[in-house]
């Protein structure tokens, strides 16, 4: 019972050893005694939590970085998921939850197993066949019931390469999130996008999924056999500034690009913006992956929380009223946002607090 608990590693004296402080089931520290000798068993199995990642974005150096032939251009530039800003995506597949830390593994939490159980790696689940081992984002195509992985690792022979392809879109067989092998008897497959250097993010809209690269916008629509999905390039001049910088409301998909705001509602259109210079002349591009879009549908608003140039954390917002076609901005730190619907009022998070918005008359509702 002493060892069969969750522990935090205290020290790592060598590459192959670590220490922790033993405790009883009440949390009280315990020490070894004579009766412990010979009672430890011949081996100990440990299950480890995944690395928490970083709280800042690190700009990679290497291929495509800087000017042609200078500095580290042409060298390996990949950063591991553990050594990069930790961003999560998740989506429901039926009653189960599929989750993915950007650039890391893909996990599934099974609702029937109860809240006391943890999510497990999808590729190691019994019955899994050629499930991607890494990805940039996961989405479930709700109407046709396919699991989609943006930025998956490709299939090489009879296995996955375990090396992320930032432009590869992989999708499972219909109604089966464990089957990713493309066969004539199923609808699994993959498509590699061509415009851009990496997929930045994707959102689900009406009857389609909008996928953004760093330079372009694609529409992904279910078309059935033999192709399953059609991926159409719809714009090449408006990449997404960060994975969370797009949001869907009743009038379209709104997103922040580099130096401008756009809306997609059948075609991509640049939004006239009276505060454009204020926002983009004082924004921390190096932490753009922290930018996140939000909706406040009751007030016909879409907006973005972003870090100013002097901050590595979110400290500002800009809002667009989709009915009145006006912009407004301010200073506020919010790192997550849930619009009303499931809850009565919008909920937002920052600095260990959850705030309820659009209620009361002060800034601490």
Map each language-model feature to its residues.
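Beta-sheet-dominated scaffold domains
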Residues: 194-365
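Hydrophobic or amphipathic alpha-helical targeting/insertion segments
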Residues: 95-118
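Secondary-structure transition/turn motif
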Residues: 21-29, 102, 110-112, 306-308, ...
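Short, conserved, GDST-rich strand-edge loop motifs in beta-rich repeat architectures
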Residues: 152-170, 198, 307-309
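Beta-propeller blade signature
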Residues: 162-175, 316-322
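Small/polar beta-strand repeat architecture
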Residues: 2-86, 114-120, 124-130
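Surface-exposed loop and turn segments in beta-propeller and other repeat-based domains
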Residues: 51-77, 125-128, 174-195, 274-287
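Structural signature of eukaryotic scaffold interfaces centered on beta-propeller domains
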Residues: 60-62, 66-94, 129-145, 192-205, ...
């Amino acid at each position: 019972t002493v060892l069969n608990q969750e522990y935090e590693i205290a020290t790592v004296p060598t590459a192959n050893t670590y220490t922790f402080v033993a405790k009883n089931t009440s949390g009280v520290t315990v020490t070894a005694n004579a009766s412990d000798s010979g009672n430890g068993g011949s081996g100990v199995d440990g299950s480890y939590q995944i690395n928490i990642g970083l709280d800042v974005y690190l700009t990679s150096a290497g291929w495509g970085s800087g000017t042609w032939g200078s500095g580290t251009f042409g060298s390996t530039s990949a950063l591991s998921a553990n050594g990069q800003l930790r961003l999560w995506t998740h989506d429901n597949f039926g009653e189960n939850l599929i989750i993915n830390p950007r650039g890391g593994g893909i996990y599934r939490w099974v609702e029937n197993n109860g809240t006391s159980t943890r999510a497990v790696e999808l590729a190691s689940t019994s019955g899994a066949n050629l499930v991607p081992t890494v990805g940039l984002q996961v989405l479930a195509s709700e109407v046709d019931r396919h699991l989609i992985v943006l930025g998956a690792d490709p299939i090489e022979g009879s296995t996955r390469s375990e090396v992320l392809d930032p432009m590869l879109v992989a999708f499972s067989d219909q109604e089966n999130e464990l089957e990713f092998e493309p066969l004539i008897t199923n609808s699994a497959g993959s498509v590699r996008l061509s415009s851009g250097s990496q997929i930045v993010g994707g959102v689900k809209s009406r009857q389609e999924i909008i996928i953004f690269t760093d330079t372009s916008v694609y529409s992904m629509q279910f078309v059935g056999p033999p192709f399953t999905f059609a991926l159409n390039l719809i714009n090449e001049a408006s990449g997404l500034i960060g994975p969370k910088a797009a949001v869907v409301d009743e009038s379209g998909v709104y997103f922040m690009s580099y130096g401008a705001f756009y809306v997609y509602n059948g075609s991509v259109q640049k939004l006239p913006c009276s505060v454009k210079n204020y926002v983009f002349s004082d924004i921390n591009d190096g932490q753009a992956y922290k930018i996140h879009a939000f909706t406040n549908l009751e007030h016909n608003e879409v907006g973005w929380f972003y870090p100013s140039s002097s901050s590595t954390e979110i400290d500002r917002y800009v809002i667009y009223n989709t009915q009145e076609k006006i912009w407004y901005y301010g200073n506020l730190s919010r790192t997550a946002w849930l619009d009303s619907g499931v809850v009565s009022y919008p909920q937002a998070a920052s600095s260990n607090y959850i705030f309820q918005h659009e209620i009361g008359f002060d800034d601490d509702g």
